[in-house]
């Protein structure tokens, strides 16, 4: 075969692949996998069966999660769990977004999936299972009609936390203006963290003018914050973390976590290679003492939170205890956790979009998809962070460096606990199955 014939054949195959990728269903999943469990497996299986997805792309939190704490296992380990259990490609959601409020978390994750140029759907779990209701609530919150804003301000003045004030304002607005959903239905929709995230995913899709279609899957198993492990084959990640803190038998997890993921989790815990909130105790105390009066420079630290930190600093005993000490009726514990984590990691500002797509791992069968992302995506695809500067703008490079510092802090905690050698973020290898 001549070189010309080879070129013609190559171009023809590329054209055929382009046509096939145009018809493909590529579903994005936004997750923490903290850790991976049967509920996550159920979602992946459902996406493949019901949506007929050709590929599943996961936007996964890195080493820190949305409630403002470190992930229990390192990001590459959790990415491997996901790939073994059916995901095709895992991208990192950087700490600036993974540790943000529901709105910031969702905006970052949706912008990341949208930036690949190939994701056609986003599937998220919810207690509702009705995508239409999520889109209605999302449009209402994006538009913020004047009567709704008035109700929101009223409930904030009454001393409610922002989530509680928003929920009450939406319920009253729905009833007063006879929306297709009642105030009671709105209240139910806003009653769980998964539903709230679902609304925020839909808001982000609308704001970013993305063509991605949202699809919600009704959750099976325990609720998001349910701490009871017994009697449920799909427990919450909260229940599993709580169980691990009690150092129970791994045999009790055998029907709650997929075999491949459980083997990894068991190995890491036995090696003491996992991170808990208490592992931040000394680092956070140092950060608080060395920050002087500059607390408000850090992301999510309001003047009120800064004042509470200053007034109660001498009572500091540890991360968990200090969060409990600082929370109020108006300021939730999760908001305090995020604020303190940002101070510890030195994160001072937020961003509107993720400026790159960092690959944590992929299945070999997904190589054609990676090639298509390189062609069609609007984000630089990063497989080797050490070489990323040539692909990134100065602002994006600074963003990556901030995320790298945060991951190196996580790695230092992990090494201190497990006794394993420190490995810089730039030295870590992709997970390829």
What is the predicted role of each segment?
Residues 48-49, 83, 110, 114-115:
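Non-catalytic positions within long, well-ordered alpha-helices that form the structural scaffold/packing
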